[in-house]
Amino acid sequence: MVVSKVNKSLLSSVFKSRIRPTGESSIASGNKDIAGTSQAVKDLLSSKNSSSDLEEASLQDRVSKLLHVTTSDKSSLEKNLFLKIPSFTTKIPYDISLRTKELSRERKERRVYKQNGLSRRFAKIFRDSAQKLGTEAMFGAFDRVAKEMSVTEYNAMIGVYLEHAEKSNDLDYALGHIEKAFELLKSMRDRGFLIEERVYGPLLGYLIGMDMVDEFHSFKDVIREASPGSVERLGYYEMLLWIHLGDGEKIEELCSTIDGDNGESLSVLQENYLLALCKKDQKYHLERLLEIVDITKVRSSDLLANIFEYLGRFSLDSVASRFLWELRESDEGVKNVSDLISIYSTCTPNPTVEDTILKFNKMHEELDVMPSSTSYEKLVKYSCDSNEVVTALDVVEKMGEAGLMISADILHSLLHAIDEVLEFDLVRRIHSIMCTKSVKPNTENFRSIIRLCTRIKDFEGAYNMLGNLKNFNLEPNSSMFNCILAGYFREKNVSSALMVVKQMKEAGVKPDSITFGYLINNCTQEDAITKYYEEMKQAGVQATKRIYMSLIDAYAASGKFEKAKQVLVDPDVPAINQNELKSVLISALASRGKWADALHIYEEMRKAECHVDPKSIISLIEYSDSKGELSTLVQLADDLQDDTSWIDGFFRMILFAVRNKKSSDIVDLLKRNKVRLLKKGIPVEAHFDEVFWAIAETEPSKVHLGMDLLRFMKDELGFVPSRKCLDFLLHACVNAKDLEHGLLVWKEYQSAAFPCNVLSFLRMYQVLLAAGDSEGAKALVSKIPKDDKDVQHIIEESQSAFSQAPNKKKPKKKMIVLSTK
């Protein structure tokens, strides 16, 4: 049955329990003319009414003004609405806590408008309109022009309906939006529009996840009527439905249609049934079906890949080998053997990369087939995803030796992996690979190589790559020069950076907004900032958000704080960027001594309920005045919503308290936030290491605070203190000449099951010397191995620094700081 207001109560109770909310995404964009937009929607989006006029009018009048509808026209227009869709509530009920990140990520990947630029653009427009007018007004407005909507607009609107349903934890609200999406599908059918899988797939996936069987079939019927060619693909979703519900009888009914004894190829519908079974690892049903299916009759390459992924996940070597031999002996199947070997070998659970490569090579040898470029590409990507970049480079070099083409995608995987593992020196091997004839790079590959060369300060290599472009019939672009420009600025080599700009012009490459952003951001004089900004305008380069950010940073760095503030009032600055630019201004002012001004801007934004970048709030905490109130920083930390930002800001506030003699409330603050500190996935232990380091370097040492924190970690949080924590605390005992607490810390090493290494012995030795226990120090030092010259040196320096000289004026003691690494 179709979801409607009269039958909502008939839905299964499972639906209500499965409503999964998420956070609201704020996407805003300008309303420019877009190809494929119906004239009615264009007229709606091109309204010239000012925001002030709209604010003064009622919600109903605001929508009427946008649509250019007079009061007298409303009643007649409303009678002729094409879609009879109930109005929305103005605000969306959200509850973030009940929806997992994994499900959110999975649904984002299925988003209707993700694969189509126009649909994505329209979705932004719909969201932006809802944000400004309210959802009720926005959907009512677009409802008025529904008769003239294009396919692209239908698709985008369906996507927004689904998104709102997914985000809500309100049953009626979610059902209402699914009903509206259904009405749009019916409208598309009635107008003769095809409904594509990228539109109906996420809708059916949502219904499957909510156990809505009747609704699933209603949607499926409309889709089949609108797009008869989708019948076979709808079988895939039907199989997913029964798998999700665990209905073995229905699954078996569909499986019974798959017969491999007739010698004919599988139908498209049968292949879709098999594909769903493989996707969901239905081992019981697949075990029987794969015995009767003729693998050489499978026409879908996607199904073949999924079959071998399934076989790899369950390590079904004998079945995989049989299928590969059958394909090897067939005229068409032999073309796929190498690719299927790579899929199978890389899907085997828990192997090392080395084992995977051995299996890859062995299977190719047994089947007497040569590895293909695409199979090597899969192997390279697998190695890169496993962070085995050196191994991936070895594979690529073998490809070159075999004369196989090294594609731009392979180079991209390598370059991305090098960036991820921070082994920038490996770019030199990429450079040597590029010298072979079997490489087909693109401009993005060159840009990445040039950027990595600058990271290792190999500017000569970066310029060599620019020279190599002509060997591949490629032209240099501004992004390549910008990488070199950024590298020189990073090295504070301004003269060479300016030379890059000159070289760009000589090469016929026009500087872009990023180029001017780098130039402005690295200016230290107001006149230079003005010069580059004027040059940018004369060159016809449009000022972007990044340019305005660079202006703010540059003016603040040159001490022109009022100029930095004036950037925000520039009439050319889009209103949509105001909050981001204010956040940048807060960070720029706070980091350059204008903390009070930064705090004032933040408080104004907070009162206006504007979004502030968490990094800006953290900057306020980090650069706060040492004479400031701790309560202000506590409030700032509390304002941080997401856990990652909060933990960063909270512990920066704790560090401020330790370093500025405001530590009396630290333990209370920790206890107050105990629940949040215990949240899974928050790296609390590493932050405690920093706090103990601050305690160790503070004069006078706050050993009592350190011991209180140690007890809190153990008793309240259930943490085992790290070795670093104990090392820093023991060092604090040295500074405080506190033998009593030093001995307690020494016992903590044993409680935490940390073996006392040489560094631990040396620190305890220093505690004994500093506290004047020469006998204890002598006994302990006898147990320290003295084979290492550095250890001998530290012992001698410690004896000198802590020796007693009662008849002479004591010089300031030199501290021997030991590494905690």
UniProtKB/Swiss-Prot annotation:
Tell me which UniProt keywords the record has, alphabetically: Mitochondrion, Repeat, Transit peptide
Which InterPro entries does the UniProt entry name for this protein? Pentatricopeptide_rpt, PROP1-like_PPR_dom, TPR-like_helical_dom_sf
The residues forming the signal peptide are none
Transit peptide extent on chain: 1-74
Keyword Transit peptide included in the entry's annotation: yes
PPR repeat boundaries on the chain:
372-406, 407-441, 442-476, 477-511, 512-542, 544-574, 578-612
> Where is this protein found?
Mitochondrion
Superkingdom per UniProt: Eukaryota
Q: Name one Pfam family in it.
A: PPR_long
UniProt entry tagged with the keyword Cell membrane: no
Gene3D superfamilies given in the database record = Tetratricopeptide repeat domain
Annotated stretches, region: Disordered: 801-821
Q: Which GO terms describe its cellular component?
A: mitochondrion
- Which family does the similarity line name? Belongs to the PPR family. P subfamily.
NCBIfam families xrefs: PPR
By what name is this protein known? Pentatricopeptide repeat-containing protein At4g04790, mitochondrial
Q: What organism does the record attribute this protein to?
A: Arabidopsis thaliana (Mouse-ear cress)
Lineage, uppermost ranks:
Eukaryota, Viridiplantae, Streptophyta, Embryophyta, Tracheophyta
